[in-house]
Amino acid sequence: MQIQFHLYNTLSRTKEVFNPQDQANVKMYVCGPTVYYNPHIGNSRSGVVYDLLYRIVIKIFGEKAVKYVRNITDVDDKIIDRAALLGVTIDELTDKVTKEFHKNMAYLGCMLPSIEPKATKHIDVMIAIIERLIAKDHAYIADNHVYFDVLSAPNYTELSNRNLEEMFEGVHVENSKTKKNPQDFVLWKPAKQNESANMNFESPWGLGRPGWHIECSAMSYKYLGENFDIHGGGADLIFPHHTNEIAQSRCAFPSSTYAKYWVHNGFLTVNGEKMSKSLGNFITVRDLMDKQIQGEVVRLFLLSSHYRRPLDYNDKAIEDAKKTLDYWYRAIENINVQKIDLPHDFMQSLLDDMNTPLAVKIINDYAKGVFISKTEEERQLNASAIITCANFIGLMNKTPHEWFNSGVDELYINELVNKRLEAKKQKNWLLADQIRNQLLEEKIILEDQPDGTTIWRKE
């Protein structure tokens, strides 16, 4: 029987059965980072959501049938400004932040995309598309800029489902006097005086650089063609970025529908507030890594809420994710687990618009099953279901021993445990208690065994 994957499409505002244009060549594009600042936890939500989507599509159609493109935006005004602020070159900044992004994705257990193109390597494709738009009267030159004529695009507001006036209400419009319409957006902008040479490129309109929106249209076209299946990104990209992508791509290639399914993940707040540097609640993934919060904990937190709903980062949410993973790892401890077929109810939860809260509940139910099982066979079956389901969503990639002792200096702890055992032999109870309390402060729990040995675990 054909698997049916129901996915919410922002374009139609309904859940649809995912039906790719070619089941042997499923195409997926996701907007990646602008590499001017270390990625924050909001960026990480997008990374994890589309990693899960990629895993599901691979499960249905096979790894060889799926092409996942996630771009790197390495040309942008923000990059120029931050490089100047830090006193480094553009290349130094973008290389450093790109490497950090890759470390963050690995920390969160994300698979590599099939292709990760950089905007600066595709300027020729951008120029070619802009030339097509000018030739078709969808773009024009004004004051050394090239602008897209928004009013020339059919169904410009289709994705956002708002009228034009509402969409631009309160939006700062640059160079409005030189444009045909205030809403027109830039496709190409001229170089400014004293700007870094490696952030500007030769073009038919002089030295300059592309606008943000044309970059994704060019890279998706280069690797996926005029039409592809899935386009993903954060809900904040619906307007203007994705709206403008659709407009320029469909106008450049009139027979194109561009992306068939538009998928958007919800916003992430911190303690109920929007994340911002001014509020002092701007949290990067590196901050979490430096706190030695395990990547699986952050990943489970990000999957604990439905991807389209808002998600709030707070200490309790992270603590709850850690407790849940502790529970799962404890459930499979000392059991010979086997990889089994994905349980039907678990897979159905993910096929229903990636219902991860239900998927997590199902894993919890299997963990409960381990502890109430009456036979070893039943325990093994439940434990095997836990590891199979968790692995599929990118979790539980360690042994229980590795998990509970992660970040622990085992040699140091074993030395103290042996020192305490020696103190007990000599009936130096004061020293033995001091060592126990010292380890307890470091969240190491000692368990004295009937045979006189001591085992330890991380709290």
UniProtKB/Swiss-Prot annotation:
<dbReference type="InterPro" id="IPR015803">
    <property type="entry name" value="Cys-tRNA-ligase"/>
</dbReference>
<keyword id="KW-0479">Metal-binding</keyword>
<keyword id="KW-0963">Cytoplasm</keyword>
<dbReference type="InterPro" id="IPR009080">
    <property type="entry name" value="tRNAsynth_Ia_anticodon-bd"/>
</dbReference>
<feature type="binding site">
    <location>
        <position position="277"/>
    </location>
    <ligand>
        <name>ATP</name>
    </ligand>
</feature>
<keyword id="KW-0862">Zinc</keyword>
<keyword id="KW-0030">Aminoacyl-tRNA synthetase</keyword>
<dbReference type="InterPro" id="IPR015273">
    <property type="entry name" value="Cys-tRNA-synt_Ia_DALR"/>
</dbReference>
<dbReference type="GO" id="GO:0006423">
    <property type="term" value="P:cysteinyl-tRNA aminoacylation"/>
</dbReference>
<dbReference type="InterPro" id="IPR024909">
    <property type="entry name" value="Cys-tRNA/MSH_ligase"/>
</dbReference>
<dbReference type="Pfam" id="PF01406">
    <property type="entry name" value="tRNA-synt_1e"/>
</dbReference>
<feature type="binding site">
    <location>
        <position position="31"/>
    </location>
    <ligand>
        <name>Zn(2+)</name>
    </ligand>
</feature>
<feature type="short sequence motif" description="'KMSKS' region">
    <location>
        <begin position="274"/>
        <end position="278"/>
    </location>
</feature>
<comment type="subunit">
    <text>Monomer.</text>
</comment>
<dbReference type="GO" id="GO:0004817">
    <property type="term" value="F:cysteine-tRNA ligase activity"/>
</dbReference>
<feature type="short sequence motif" description="'HIGH' region">
    <location>
        <begin position="33"/>
        <end position="43"/>
    </location>
</feature>
<dbReference type="GO" id="GO:0005524">
    <property type="term" value="F:ATP binding"/>
</dbReference>
<dbReference type="GO" id="GO:0005829">
    <property type="term" value="C:cytosol"/>
</dbReference>
<keyword id="KW-0547">Nucleotide-binding</keyword>
<keyword id="KW-0067">ATP-binding</keyword>
<feature type="binding site">
    <location>
        <position position="245"/>
    </location>
    <ligand>
        <name>Zn(2+)</name>
    </ligand>
</feature>
<keyword id="KW-0648">Protein biosynthesis</keyword>
<comment type="similarity">
    <text>Belongs to the class-I aminoacyl-tRNA synthetase family.</text>
</comment>
<keyword id="KW-0436">Ligase</keyword>
<dbReference type="InterPro" id="IPR014729">
    <property type="entry name" value="Rossmann-like_a/b/a_fold"/>
</dbReference>
<dbReference type="InterPro" id="IPR032678">
    <property type="entry name" value="tRNA-synt_1_cat_dom"/>
</dbReference>
<feature type="binding site">
    <location>
        <position position="241"/>
    </location>
    <ligand>
        <name>Zn(2+)</name>
    </ligand>
</feature>
<dbReference type="GO" id="GO:0008270">
    <property type="term" value="F:zinc ion binding"/>
</dbReference>
<feature type="binding site">
    <location>
        <position position="216"/>
    </location>
    <ligand>
        <name>Zn(2+)</name>
    </ligand>
</feature>
<protein>
    <recommendedName>
        <fullName>Cysteine--tRNA ligase</fullName>
        <ecNumber>6.1.1.16</ecNumber>
    </recommendedName>
</protein>
